[in-house]
């Protein structure tokens, strides 16, 4: 599955007041220091991995207070509901650093989580991802589209993000299964805005078209990293140009779709390579891009090559906006569907409908 560590979406049962924002999340959302500059200035550790180093020490701007299920009723309730419905979440499977914040919610935001469809086992083994892998995962649950749509409709959410594992063992990569889920959600709640973080479907245009015309509102597929690093970071079946083609074709068959992608920083990419990647994305008519820091999920995964400073994330946000992206979210702990982005995209989509 592509970029499972970059997702978010799905509000919990109890509504709370919403705050609509025009820009991405502030860096103050991610650090506890009085100022970003102070946190960076006081850090005495290395920012780049050097020869002979085992790993980099975690800098202060990446440290977050974890919210345990016992500490927040929203976390506990959502976990029980998802388990009862046999629904997987990428928040748990991919060890997302924002799980406690999003599942727990706050006074000015909804508790959120991301539903991961087609099981919790992927046919691909990307070197940055902690989701389980197998050549032949269990068969699809035929009741999953119905269960998922029923659950989401009962939660009363306005904006939902769905993601999935890769299923190269299926002829269509699972496109029919995912399409059915989206269509049932729209049937049960027509006003629901749906974002899907999708696989590349092994480059199959028919599967891409099935999803682009399914009724979803945001077609997301993550490029993950620059072209040079793609063979090293992603599963060999996940190709850089193949990802660009999927995003481009989705826009071609459904021009009103918002297309979206995400880039991890800190894997050894050069600035010129990031700029080329952004140029490739704009040439493919991608509307939204997010940047986040790669963080090693376990010792078996790729080492972090560089801690990218918050200031640098701000610079990439400004650079991307000048290229014409509709929306940019950039920060150390930003993931591809960070909730501030969801609220922003919700307003964009509503305005387009009116």
Swiss-Prot record:
Enzyme Commission no: 2.8.1.8
UniProt entry tagged with the keyword Ribosomal protein: no
A GO cellular component annotation in the UniProt record: mitochondrion
UniProt cross-references to Gene3D superfamilies, sorted A to Z: Aldolase class I
Anything else known: This protein may be expected to contain an N-terminal transit peptide but none has been predicted.
Cited NCBIfam families: lipA (TIGR00510), PRK05481.1 (NF004019), PRK12928.1 (NF009544)
Protein name: Lipoyl synthase, mitochondrial
Annotated source species: Caenorhabditis elegans
